[in-house]
């Protein structure tokens, strides 16, 4: 029996957001059940820690230097072949409901089809998907959800005003003044989380059992802004939320942690260096209070609970159609969120667990007869496309650089899964940052800093995460670890694929 594939993604969710991964705040029972009944990959990393490059890797099974989407604001050529094309060519119906972000949101509609689909009353086909209905976590003027909300003008005006003439907004309506916390008077059932699950069920309802489907259900949350329906504030009292383990109200302690790392970490914290273009220009993390960190975490976990319930709703629909027996379900995110770790917020050129370490779960179809398992060996987004092909019983496209995910730790060892790679390359005028990371199964994480406006190419980070899971002691310059550093950097550059000769232009900020 041919198997269906449901890929569920969130945007900016930490590994420890889920109960099955040690989370203690949000109730994520539906996603936790996928873990219990399926395979939980305990060391999955993205290949880039921001949206567009990470999503391009999911779409192609390629590392960043191969697909060329090095940072937000870049887009693969529209004609570039993707895993959605490949599955479609082999008999699958294909759809994406929710956040795509394969093209810049702030790019011109004339240049990018995603930015004019809704205004043209189109749902595709596009980039291999027969059907697309798009949503974002703010109103940029051209998503299907944006158009849907035109029927609710008062509620639409209640959403966070994300972009101002100064760039990304920092305004707040929260109890603590925390940036981008914005409870709003909007019914939950028209909020984008439930909209995505409802549109997913609607498309699935058009499918028959005689043809397989590949459906990507992509939630815009828990990405900032944290503008949740105010009716849901009762779920988690921000005053009861514990501070993150890697946050301290002692500024001197935070600074001592940051001083272990290269200069742009401390520079972001105190506002002395502007290298993180993924956060509002006017936001200075050092100004955050402990209560603001608590409130942001509470809003994030409320969004996580809403996502979990939406996931449960769609899984219930699959049960009603008797599709669980031949449907494989994947759950992951594009990247994480600092969420107060090291006194920081948002994301950027920081290769730490908060941003790289992903929730990553595969619930195989019942007909696959695959036992539940936990896999400790490293895997990544780069492996998803090849796994989808293995499920479909087809060979992956030649451009795929990953391999099918192991279904047990024994299989991971047989596959010789020892490393996973993550890249960062951003260029904004004179400000550029270039980081390359390798995580090894023995627990070492090594990040090489290449030459940039700030670094001369000799800097880096090295952590023994078995002894130092919080990445507080940087061993890069420790003579006792010089051999480890050399071996890992050599392995890193030997393992990275050749860089594509195609230099994609950056067309918009995001």
Task: Name these PLM-found stretches.
Residues 496-500:
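Short arginine-rich
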Residues 1-449, 455-458, 471-490, 504, ...:
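Formylglycine-dependent sulfatase
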Residues 468:
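Intrinsically disordered, low-complexity polar regions and short flexible loop motifs
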């Amino acid at each position: 029996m041919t198997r269906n594939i449901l890929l569920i993604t969130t945007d900016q969710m930490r590994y420890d957001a889920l109960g099955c991964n040690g989370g203690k705040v949000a109730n994520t029972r539906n996603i936790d059940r996928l873990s219990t009944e399926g395979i939980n990959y305990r060391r999955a990393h993205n290949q880039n820690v921001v949206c567009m490059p990470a999503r391009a890797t999911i779409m192609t099974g390629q590392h960043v230097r191969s697909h060329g989407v090095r940072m937000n604001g870049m887009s693969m050529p529209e004609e570039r072949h993707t895993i959605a094309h490949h599955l479609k060519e082999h008999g699958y119906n294909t759809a994406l409901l929710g956040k795509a972000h394969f093209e810049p949101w702030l790019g011109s509609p004339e240049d990018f089809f995603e930015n004019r689909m809704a205004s043209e009353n189109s749902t595709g086909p596009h980039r291999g998907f027969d059907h697309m209905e798009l949503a974002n976590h703010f109103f940029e003027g051209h998503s299907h959800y944006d158009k849907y909300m035109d029927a609710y003008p008062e509620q639409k005006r209640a959403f966070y005003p994300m972009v101002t003439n100064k760039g990304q907004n920092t305004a707040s309506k929260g109890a603590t003044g925390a940036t981008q916390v914005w409870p709003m008077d909007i019914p939950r059932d028209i909020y984008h989380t439930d909209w995505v699950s409802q549109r997913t069920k609607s498309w699935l309802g058009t499918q028959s059992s005689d043809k397989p489907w590949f459906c990507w259900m992509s939630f815009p949350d828990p990405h900032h802004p944290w503008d949740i329906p105010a009716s849901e504030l009762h779920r988690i009292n921000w005053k009861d939320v514990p501070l993150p383990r890697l946050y301290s109200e002692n500024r001197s302690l935070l600074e001592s942690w940051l001083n272990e790392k290269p200069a742009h970490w401390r520079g972001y914290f105190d506002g002395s260096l502007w290298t993180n273009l993924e956060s509002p220009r006017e936001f200075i993390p050092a100004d955050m209070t402990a209560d603001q960190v608590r409130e942001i975490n509470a809003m994030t976990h409320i969004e996580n609970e809403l996502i979990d319930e939406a996931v449960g709703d769609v899984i219930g629909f699959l049960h009603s159609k008797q599709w669980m027996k031949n449907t494989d379900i994947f759950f992951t995110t594009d990247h994480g969120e600092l969420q107060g770790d090291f006194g920081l917020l948002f994301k950027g050129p920081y290769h730490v667990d908060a941003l790289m370490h992903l929730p990553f779960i595969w619930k195989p179809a019942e007909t696959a007869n695959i036992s539940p398992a936990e896999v400790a060996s490293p895997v990544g987004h780069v492996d998803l496309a090849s796994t989808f092909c293995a499920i479909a019983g087809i060979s992956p496209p030649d451009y795929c650089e990953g391999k099918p995910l192991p279904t047990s730790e024994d299989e991971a060892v047989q596959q010789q899964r020892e490393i996973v790679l993550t890249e960062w390359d951003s260029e904004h005028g004179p400000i550029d940052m270039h980081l390359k990371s390798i995580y090894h199964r023995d627990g070492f994480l090594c990040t090489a800093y290449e030459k940039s406006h700030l670094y001369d190419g000799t800097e880096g980070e090295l952590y023994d995460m078995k002894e130092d899971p919080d990445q507080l002691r940087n061993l890069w310059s420790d003579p006792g670890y010089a051999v480890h550093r050399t071996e890992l950097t050599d392995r890193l550059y030997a393992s990275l694929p050749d860089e594509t000769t195609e230099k994609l232009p950056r067309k918009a900020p995001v």
